[in-house]
Amino acid sequence: MFDSSFGSSKFHKLLFRFDQDIASKTRADKCPYCGGKLHVGNYLRHPRGTYGMEHEQANLRFSFCCGREGCRRRVTPPSVRFLGRKVYSGATVVLVTAMRCRDAKQALNRIKALFGVGNRTVQRWRIWWQQYFPKTIFWTIAKGYLSEPIQETSLPASLLDRFQGANLESRLFATLRFLTMLSAPYFKINHRGASPRRT
């Protein structure tokens, strides 16, 4: 299942450019809370499992801050490189957990050697994918766009298998695109039940 292209600079440049495009569109749409102008407020993250990535590709999180007085809220767009607040890169979380779903021990050991992911971490990821992810608002809505039901006990491998492509790189990219809204805090309904303004 593992493909060396996963660690290629070409693959990670593709992810970075996609995030750049999302960020540009987010800024053009203005603040989703008040409609104010957004100013660049990028910040650095230091995710693990960034094999093959250059510093900027791995660490730069595109983000904006509203310039309108009285709002000043942060707007962080969706991302294919980051999966919410998880310490490891989104690609690593998806791929390594999918390996574990298949019990492909040799492949998993190879991934662990590359990314330094311990067994306990992988087990936590499996629990998240199979017990918590299916209960998210995102999945409740997004699974309706899939042509056939996904076997949730095999997530994320079953989701990765759903997307077609010539190699693992293209299938993984399609999966990460599908999951982008998991990394968009402002998209989620807040604890008071209020949704951000959409323009």
Specify the residue positions occupied by each region the protein language model found.
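General helical secondary-structure elements
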Residues: 41, 120-122, 193
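Generic structural signal for short, flexible, solvent-exposed coil/loop and linker residues
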Residues: 7, 11, 20, 53-55, ...
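Long C-terminal interaction/binding lobes of large macromolecular proteins
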Residues: 1-12, 23, 27, 127-128, ...
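Helix-boundary capping/turn motifs
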Residues: 3-9, 68-69, 100-101
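Short, positively charged, Gly/Tyr-enriched micro-motifs
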Residues: 63, 70-150
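Generic preference for well-ordered secondary structure
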Residues: 2, 6, 14-18, 50, ...
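N-terminal juxtadomain amphipathic helix
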Residues: 15-66
